[in-house]
């Protein structure tokens, strides 16, 4: 198998990289839409290529340095947000509430680990979704195209034809979202002296001792005459991330940095390649091999040791720190069998990566007519992830969660949300998300574990 991988890599290197060289590998793709009009697609791409980048090269460089710190155990990475953004649920209030939730989790993780928390939101670009099947069958037997995210088509069964103009809508929504995030981050909203202002309708740290202890820590810093106007106390950085799936959109927002002359994907600070698109011959790997953003690779039990090494050599040929984040998604029943072998492979080959645990995707179950996840399984996979890294002397760099500040009933916690109450407020268009109450309770349980095992 390794021989075939190496031969394929040699063939790939014969193609000079450009933002559009992924098209040479398009025949291997099973996820991108087939647009009826290539002329309309080209027109949309030309329009987007003339628009301002959503993020800057300098922001991407800073994030890469921070992710390097997470890989070295000097920072902690938290990735969180909706499974998929939507056009109809977009609102200032939703973005503000997700921001509040990120702040609460961030400060709890920093208090727990004693490390700065890198906050990365699945937002301002997380519109496209891979699907297992290109078609779905309605109850009447009619076969229609699968919904693949608002940037591609509509959840409405009458509007499933892919429309390239939806990329323009996604770009403008992302622009508004980033404007709000930057205003919140640098306008005093994230001031740690205003913890009470981070309150949500459901889910807040004030219900436990952690809130009191964090407030006491802030009070102590004030006693040391650390200025309450210091930017460390009043400002924060929120980075954006999404799956690199819809390559015509990514290509149109690719830019060259005028200073370094390097190429960046300017649709987001951080791009990841998913389980379904990380094949060595996929166009997504080809595109990501040429941009200088920090990159994530989702890996499951299906990823072999040789495949992982080949991916790293393709996407990070210079073995740079901070470039690659390995986002593991095994499931609670498989992590013990597969994470150790991959850690050992990385150690033996002296690869530099940051490890991050995605405990969501490997724990998805069908419960009646709904896809759901059991909170206890999600937490248990996180705890096993940390225990395994501790056993191997490696750094567990971060956690990745699908979550929402809304009071949804999509994941089962055996307390407020049961199998019978899933239908009460199940609104996700794709995968089930933790609600604010669930995610904060889970992070508090993680904090208890961390203090017992790592402090």
PLM segments and residue spans:
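Sec-dependent signal peptide recognition
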Residues: 1-8
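N-terminal amphipathic alpha-helix/helix-capping segment at the start of soluble metabolic enzymes
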Residues: 20-31, 58-74
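N-terminal signal-anchor module of multipass membrane proteins
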Residues: 31-46, 51-59, 75, 80-81
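Glycine-rich, charged/polar anion/phosphate-binding loops
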Residues: 62-64, 281-284, 340-342
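Active-site-facing alpha/beta catalytic cores
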Residues: 74, 84-85, 89-331, 373, ...
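Non-transmembrane, aqueous-exposed alpha-helical and coiled segments at domain scale
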Residues: 323-327, 332-355, 361-408
């Amino acid at each position: 198998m390794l021989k075939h991988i190496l031969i394929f890599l040699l063939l790939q290197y014969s193609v000079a990289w450009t933002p559009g060289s992924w098209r040479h590998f398009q025949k291997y793709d099973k996820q991108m839409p087939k647009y009826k009009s290539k002329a309309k697609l080209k027109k949309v791409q030309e329009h987007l290529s003339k628009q301002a980048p959503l993020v800057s090269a300098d922001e991407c460089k800073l994030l890469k340095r921070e992710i390097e710190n997470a890989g070295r155990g000097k920072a902690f990475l938290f990735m969180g947000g909706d499974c998929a953004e939507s056009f109809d649920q977009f609102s200032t209030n939703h973005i503000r509430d997700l921001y509040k939730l990120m702040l609460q989790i961030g400060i709890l993780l920093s208090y727990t680990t004693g490390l700065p928390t890198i906050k990365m939101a699945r937002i301002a670009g997380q519109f496209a979704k891979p699907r297992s099947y290109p078609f779905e069958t309605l109850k009447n037997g009619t076969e229609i195209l699968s919904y693949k995210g608002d940037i591609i088509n509509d959840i409405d069964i009458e509007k499933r034809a892919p429309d390239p103009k939806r990329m323009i809508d996604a770009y403008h929504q992302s622009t508004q979202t980033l404007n709000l995030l930057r205003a919140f981050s640098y306008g005093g909203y994230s001031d740690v002296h205003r913890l009470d202002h981070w309150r949500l309708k459901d889910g807040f740290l004030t219900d436990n001792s952690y809130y009191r202890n964090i407030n006491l820590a802030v009070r102590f810093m004030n006693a040391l005459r650390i200025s309450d106007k210091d930017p460390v106390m009043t400002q924060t950085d929120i980075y954006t991330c999404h799956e690199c799936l819809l390559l015509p959109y990514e290509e149109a927002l690719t830019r060259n940095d005028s200073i370094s002359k390097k190429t960046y994907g300017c649709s987001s600070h951080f791009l990841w390649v998913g389980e379904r698109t990380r094949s060595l011959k996929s166009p997504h790997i080809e595109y990501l091999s040429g941009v200088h953003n920090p990159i994530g690779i989702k890996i499951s039990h299906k990823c072999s040791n040789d495949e992982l090494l080949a991916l790293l050599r393709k996407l990070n040929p210079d073995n740079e720190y901070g470039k690659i984040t390995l986002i593991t998604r095994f499931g609670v029943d498989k992590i013990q069998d597969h994470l150790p072998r991959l850690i050992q492979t990385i150690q033996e080959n002296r690869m530099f990566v940051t490890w991050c645990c995605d405990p969501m995707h490997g724990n998805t179950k069908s419960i009646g007519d709904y896809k759901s996840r059991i909170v206890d399984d999600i937490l248990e996979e996180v705890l096993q992830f940390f225990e395994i890294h501790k056993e191997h002397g490696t750094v567990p760099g971060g956690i990745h969660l699908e979550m929402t500040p809304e009071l949804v009933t999509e994941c089962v916690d055996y307390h407020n949300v049961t199998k019978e109450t899933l239908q009460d407020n199940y609104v996700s268009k794709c995968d089930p998300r933790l609600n604010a109450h669930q995610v904060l309770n889970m992070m508090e349980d993680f904090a208890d574990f961390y203090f017992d095992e790592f402090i």
